[in-house]
Amino acid sequence: MVKAKIAVNGYGTIGKRVADAVQAQDDMEIIGVSKTKPNYEAAVAHQKGYDLFAPASNSGAFEKAGIPLAGTIEEMVEKADLVVDCTPGGIGEANKPMYEKAGVKAIWQGGEDHELAGFSFNAASNYEGALGRDLVRVVSCNTTGLCRVIYPIDRELGVKKVRVTLARRATDPNDIKKGPINAIVPDPIKLPSHHGPDIKSVLPHINITTAALKIPTTLMHLHTVNMEVNTDCTAEDINRIFSSQSRIRFMSQGINSTAEIIELARDMGRPRNDMWENCIWPESITVHEREFYFFQAIHQESIVVPETVDAIRAMMELESDGAKSIQKTNKAIGL
């Protein structure tokens, strides 16, 4: 089998996870990753055997740090069939001309606007729409988590409306520059938040409104979800629908917080204590007439990683069936 050649531009929080997940597949391989500075992540990438690429202007800094380079970022892009752009939000747009010049396919993350790629992706919701595409945006962690629960409910019961309050982690565990440390911040204060329109980039017919706030934690996001459906249902019906989704995990056995979820991931031996699944508390599923409520936690560092692998597979036309790709990705990474 000829493997798809994948480059990761930006070996940071998402990029390093995507690289490892791609490398675990049998139909794609990493041909290079990029860093702009010779920090510890660059050193670890080299230690793990990844070919490392950097801007030509920074090659001297890498040489001084004793971290060998395989070439420039432009040279990495030229070698790839597809580039996963994991650079910080807003920077990816500036890279688009480089990808177009090289004639390679590109995936951006949810920090970029939908218009950049013209197609926003969630594996369960619209896999087939990404088949053969040159440009795709994998939606953000929060949007991914919401698509995963809205789509199967809509398919079986029909969704009339969705209302979500998102308690967002302030920043990632390794980020010492952001906050808050001792505050709760409505973000944005002017409602609704951007998450509803982002859901519509994948599921345009869904009536959804969202409100978000930042809280002083780094572990996970927490969603309070309210859905109104078109069909009579029970909590058991909702439980059954969620149970059919391989990327939804029910929290039980005394797990009552995001801290315990992360500890569970550690105890399971997950790499970087990643929890790729939506984490739903089944006891929170409460039905009143045709409305129901529940809590779910979202691990922002990892939830988009399997989605990105599926996006690669669709764009490279390695698998035409979304369900089969999801199964293949899950098995390879240990989900």
UniProtKB/Swiss-Prot annotation:
Active site per database record: 141 (nucleophile)
Binding site for NAD(+): 13-14, 111, 169, 300
Taxonomy, superkingdom: Archaea
One Pfam family this sequence matches: Gp_dh_C
Keywords from the UniProt entry: Cytoplasm, Glycolysis, NAD, NADP, Oxidoreductase
Biological process annotations from GO: glycolytic process; lysine biosynthetic process via diaminopimelate
Molecular function terms, GO-annotated: 4-hydroxy-tetrahydrodipicolinate reductase; glyceraldehyde-3-phosphate dehydrogenase (NAD+) (phosphorylating) activity; glyceraldehyde-3-phosphate dehydrogenase (NADP+) (phosphorylating) activity; NAD binding; NADP binding
EC number: 1.2.1.59
Compartments (UniProt record): Cytoplasm
Residues given in the record as D-glyceraldehyde 3-phosphate binding sites: 140-142, 171, 195-196
InterPro entries assigned to the protein according to its UniProt record, in alphabetical order: DapB_N, GlycerAld/Erythrose_P_DH, GlycerAld_3-P_DH_AS, GlycerAld_3-P_DH_cat, GlycerAld_3-P_DH_NAD(P)-bd, Glyceraldehyde-3-P_DH_2_arc, NAD(P)-bd_dom_sf
Pathway info: Carbohydrate degradation; glycolysis; pyruvate from D-glyceraldehyde 3-phosphate: step 1/5
Top-rank EC class of the record's enzyme: oxidoreductase
GO cellular component, one term: cytoplasm
Known catalytic reactions: D-glyceraldehyde 3-phosphate + phosphate + NADP(+) = (2R)-3-phospho-glyceroyl phosphate + NADPH + H(+); D-glyceraldehyde 3-phosphate + phosphate + NAD(+) = (2R)-3-phospho-glyceroyl phosphate + NADH + H(+)
Predominant location: cytoplasm
Similarity remark: Belongs to the glyceraldehyde-3-phosphate dehydrogenase family.
Quaternary structure and partners: Homotetramer.
HAMAP family, per database record: G3P_dehdrog_arch (MF_00559)
Name of the protein: Glyceraldehyde-3-phosphate dehydrogenase
Provenance organism: Methanosarcina mazei (strain ATCC BAA-159 / DSM 3647 / Goe1 / Go1 / JCM 11833 / OCM 88) (Methanosarcina frisia)
